Amino acid sequence: MKKFLKLTTVVVSMVMALTFVSCANGNENGQLNLVGTYGLSKVEVESISKDSNGEESITMTTTMPTSTSIRQYGTQKYIDGETTTDMEMDVTITKTEGGYSFNWAKYNIDGVAQGDDAKTKQQEQFDDDTWKEYTAPFAMTYTTTADGTWNDNSNPASSGTYTVDEATSKVTMTTLIDGGNTLETPVKEELSYSNNGKTLVFVEEESSVDGTYKMTMTLTRK
């Protein structure tokens, strides 16, 4: 899980163990089922950064609707003194045989739709390394078992245990081995579950004098 969290922090860079459950093989009759393989389906980032030059706020969502495409949509606001610049975007990027194609549903600055020149400048920042950074988190999976353990699909793998609290709809995942290395101090992370266990949500928040940061990751059982 620690490795997964590190990977997801790059997703917005373009702009600028459980107890045993009774229903281990399905989700019939609305029973709670937290056994299976989960993969990332959505990353949402809300951040505000401040420095001597001004303040920037970003609200951005990244999804991977197909194995060869990612979608990024949201807003960016920059405040410099009395000047405020607002950007809105919604773009789907598809990996093709010869590179990448861009389908812009929206690219507005201060409410004005941008032309091909502005879009091209954004597209020129995108390369194979950027694609790998964006898609790597979506390739990771987490498999939970009925005996209260989990492991991911990295090599070397991370693994640990998990417990569930049905009263609060929370799952606590404990990392015992991180990338093949046994941790002296296990790391615990809390996730919320919904849809009878089909969806897991992890929220990470940070706050300092330089701004705030919140990342919400949605994992869906395959």
Report each predicted region and the residues it spans.
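Short, low-complexity, Pro/Ser/Thr/Gly-rich segments in the mature regions of secreted, periplasmic
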Residues: 214-222
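C-terminal motif of bacterial Sec signal peptides marking the signal peptidase cleavage site
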Residues: 18-22
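Repetitive helical segments and hydrophobic/amphipathic motifs
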Residues: 11-15
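N-terminal helix-cap/turn-to-beta initiation motif at the start of protein domains
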Residues: 24-40
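Contiguous, well-ordered beta-strand patches that form the walls/edges
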Residues: 46-50, 76-197, 201-203, 213
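Post-signal-peptide N-terminal segment of Sec-exported extracytoplasmic proteins
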Residues: 37-82, 95
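Bacterial N-terminal signal peptides that target proteins for export
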Residues: 1-10
